[in-house]
Amino acid sequence: MRRFDAAALFTAMDAQRVARGMTWEQVGREIGVSAATIQRARRGGRMEVDGMLAMVGWLGVPVETFVRDSEH
């Protein structure tokens, strides 16, 4: 079975955000979601697939970068 590694996504997003000298509000505007939505998802809250895909797209990497094999 495969799963999406949200923790790895947010680690990568945070590194990119810092490298670009951006706030979470600025990131949210570029992605098209609120900073509160990003923060909620970072804390383990639910997020729509479209939002997650937008976050991956913002990083400019394939979604497979964050897909992991899981046990059971």
Segments predicted by a language model, with ranges:
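Short C-terminal boundary/hinge segments that cap the last helix of small helical domains
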Residues: 60-72
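A short, Lys/Arg-rich alpha-helix, primarily the initiator
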Residues: 1-26
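Key DNA-contacting residues within the recognition helix of helix-turn-helix
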Residues: 39-40, 53, 67
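Recognition helix of helix-turn-helix/homeodomain-like DNA-binding domains
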Residues: 32-47
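Residues within the alpha-helical elements of helix-turn-helix
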Residues: 30, 58
